[in-house]
């Protein structure tokens, strides 16, 4: 009976440790998202800005790609009804000198893992960690731009999977590159 009790106690301790670890990870993830909320807050002057205008830009420290600088952007885009919106994006810019004709751009309309604020690629702790071709694109001189899509990680409804909305977000993300150092196409 003593061995059975010891095993049950041990199983209880292991279950409690797993539960605490899971809760701790969840709390840390929520805190990370809370810390990013100010960056993704919709500026008051969105409607007056041109499509592609960049409201905020900051380095992405957890996205390290050899030969590149990485940025998180908040830029102006449009919803399918023509109203102004904001979207986040990831911009990856080669550090090598730009060719005289400008840099080629690879605009990536990626999939997503959900519709929560933390599912937006530019809000993830380790964005694009399983996308090996990005390093090859950078090595070949491409600027890579990957929009989150309006409403995914930003305020307002998500129009994810609506072709026109994604086209607007992708086109305006490319326009936003005009406001990123050394990235203009």
Task: Tell what function each PLM region has.
Residues 151-159:
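Glycine-rich "HGGG/HGxG" loop immediately N-terminal to the catalytic nucleophile
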Residues 93-102, 175-185:
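Gly/Ser-rich "nucleophile elbow"/oxyanion-hole loop immediately N-terminal to the catalytic nucleophile
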Residues 1-13:
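N-terminal export and membrane-targeting signals
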Residues 105, 138-148:
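A fold-wide structural signal in alpha/beta-hydrolase
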């Amino acid at each position: 009976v003593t061995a059975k009790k010891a095993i049950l106690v041990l199983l209880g301790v292991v279950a409690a440790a797993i539960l605490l670890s899971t809760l701790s990870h969840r709390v840390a993830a929520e805190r990370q998202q809370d810390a990013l909320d100010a960056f993704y807050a919709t500026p008051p002057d969105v409607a007056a800005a041109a499509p592609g205008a960049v409201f905020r830009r900051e380095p992405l420290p957890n996205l390290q790609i050899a030969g590149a600088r990485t940025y998180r952007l908040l830029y102006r885009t449009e919803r399918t009804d023509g109203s102004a919106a904001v979207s986040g994006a990831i911009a990856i810019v080669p550090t090598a000198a730009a060719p005289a004709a400008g840099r080629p751009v690879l605009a990536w309309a990626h999939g997503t893992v959900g519709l929560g604020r933390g599912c937006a690629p530019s809000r993830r702790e380790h964005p694009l960690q399983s996308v090996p071709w990005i390093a090859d694109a950078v090595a070949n001189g491409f600027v890579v731009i990957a929009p989150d899509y309006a409403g995914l990680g930003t305020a307002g409804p998500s129009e994810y999977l609506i072709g026109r909305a994604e086209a607007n977000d992708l086109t305006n993300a490319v326009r936003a590159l005009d406001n990123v150092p050394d990235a203009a196409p």
